């Protein structure tokens, strides 16, 4: 009787089938886990990015202000201006003491009881793009004309090209003779890259959207409205010059 020195074809096929039964589910589990991990990182990144954007917007709005017009009542609507063009692009603009390094250079244009401060102008632009549901959010800083860093067209920065929705809404609450004005900020960001949506590699109906909201207190405005008759040093004239 001879000893068997090799596997038969049937035995090899049985071994291969058993290995496939083990490998295929394992591969699917690992593949699904990898995709889930990547998706988790994407969503975590977009949440952190949205929080950074809200922090920047909040900083700009909390230091917002308005030109002084004697004899007129002042409200949050003096600060805020919004326009929409024929293409659906939205531009939100307001004056503010915010503006990077310039914040530490807010100096009076004259001495005395009414010393004007110079303002910067900031624009947030929500731009629609052809062929994609993604919008672009830009921030443009126009430094006061007397500032050495001021330049025509302002300092433009793209904040995000993954925007679904962006809104700043001014509101005022009145009670017992006092009022409190504030801004409601709403922001929605996609967790996918805009180029992927344009190429059709993702389903726009299944994209994860991270939603953010914040309320912002315009400190200077509320202080002036609720403390009438105080020194007007923090009123400002954006067109004031040295002299």
Predicted regions and their residues:
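Type IV pilin-like appendage domain
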Residues: 83-176, 206-209, 236
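Short helix/strand-bridging catalytic loops that position acidic/His residues to coordinate divalent metals
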Residues: 38-43, 148-154, 201-204
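Aliphatic-rich helix starts adjacent to a transmembrane/signal segment
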Residues: 7-63
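Exposed loop/turn and edge beta-strand positions of beta-sandwich/beta-sheet ligand-binding modules
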Residues: 12, 118, 179
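N-terminal leader/signal peptides at the extreme start of proteins
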Residues: 1-7
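Short linear sequence signals and composition-biased patches located at protein termini or domain-edge surfaces
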Residues: 153-243
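Short, glycine/small-hydrophobic-rich surface segments
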Residues: 61-94
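Short, conserved loop/turn and helix-capping segments at secondary-structure boundaries
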Residues: 47, 51, 78-81, 153, ...
């Amino acid at each position: 009787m001879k000893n068997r020195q090799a596997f038969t074809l049937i035995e090899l096929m049985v071994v291969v089938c058993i290995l496939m039964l083990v490998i295929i589910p394992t591969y699917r589990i690992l593949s699904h886990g990898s995709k889930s991990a990547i998706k988790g990182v994407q969503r975590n990144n977009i949440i952190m990015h949205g929080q950074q954007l809200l922090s920047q917007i909040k900083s700009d709005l909390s230091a917002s202000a308005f030109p002084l017009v004697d004899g007129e009542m002042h409200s949050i609507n003096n600060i805020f201006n919004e326009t929409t063009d024929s293409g659906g692009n939205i531009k939100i603009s307001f004056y503010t003491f915010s503006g990077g390094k310039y914040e530490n250079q807010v100096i009076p244009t004259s001495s005395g009881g009414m010393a004007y401060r110079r303002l910067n102008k900031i624009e947030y632009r929500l731009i629609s793009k052809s062929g994609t549901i993604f919008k672009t959010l830009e921030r443009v800083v126009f430094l006061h004309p007397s500032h050495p860093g001021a330049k025509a067209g302002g300092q433009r920065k793209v904040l995000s090209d993954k925007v679904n929705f962006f809104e700043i809404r001014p509101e005022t609450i009145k009670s017992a003779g006092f009022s409190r004005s504030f801004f409601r900020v709403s922001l929605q960001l996609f967790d996918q890259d805009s180029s992927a949506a344009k190429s059709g590699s993702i389903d726009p109906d299944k994209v994860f959207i991270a939603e953010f909201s914040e309320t912002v207190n315009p400190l200077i405005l509320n202080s002036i409205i609720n403390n009438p008759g105080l020194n007007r040093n923090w009123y400002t004239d954006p067109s004031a010059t040295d002299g």
